[in-house]
Amino acid sequence: MTQKNGPLRVGIGGPVGSGKTTLTEKLCKAMRDKYSVAIITNDIYTQEDALILARRQALSEDRIIGVETGGCPHTAIREDASINLQAVVEMTRRFPDLDVVFIESGGDNLAATFSPDLADLTLYVISVCQGEEIPRKGGPGITRSDFLVINKSDLAPYVHVDLEVMEADAMRMRAKRPFGFTDLHRGKGVQEIIDFIVENGGLEPRSN
């Protein structure tokens, strides 16, 4: 069903290579049969992530808009989100029944956050390959995101990372905010994230 105040806007942030685009792909493929879904991607100089998602057939091409931000990627999702807000308006014009828009940030550091004017819910993706210490380094992405995704958990033995240490640090840094370990390549942990989005975003499956 269409949201009364427009589509639910879900921001997906995280460093380069953490798995943001793969998460966006998995969420769209899992949710597109129950909800009207669209994607807005952010890249500094290209529309590479939008093209990747189109090639992977996450959604039809008309449901994907690639935004070229220029400069620092966090500016387009926080200080001046107008380019992304315009893309949301355009996507809503194309699909008046839109339920949810995933807004994928360009790769950025742990200080990146979404403006509350742009995102209703935020997911922040980190990878175990970036180091066991990442959760305890903090930063708004780690501490304030609505759901922290700790991706590539399957690679922990190969990069000498103790997942129990990461779990304890994430729990301490995030207080009671939820987080989860994922292996997005194999789809592990995706359903937990979907359940979080549906419950906290007030989504209801559209009737046939």
Swiss-Prot record:
Top-level lineage group: Bacteria
Binding site for GTP: 14-21
Endpoints of the signal sequence: none
GO CC, alphabetical: cytoplasm
GO molecular function: GTP binding; GTPase activity; nickel cation binding
This protein's UniProt keywords: Chaperone, Cytoplasm, GTP-binding, Nickel insertion, Nucleotide-binding
Coiled coil: none
Family: Belongs to the SIMIBI class G3E GTPase family. UreG subfamily.
Protein name per Swiss-Prot or TrEMBL: Urease accessory protein UreG 1
Source species: Brucella ovis (strain ATCC 25840 / 63/290 / NCTC 10512)
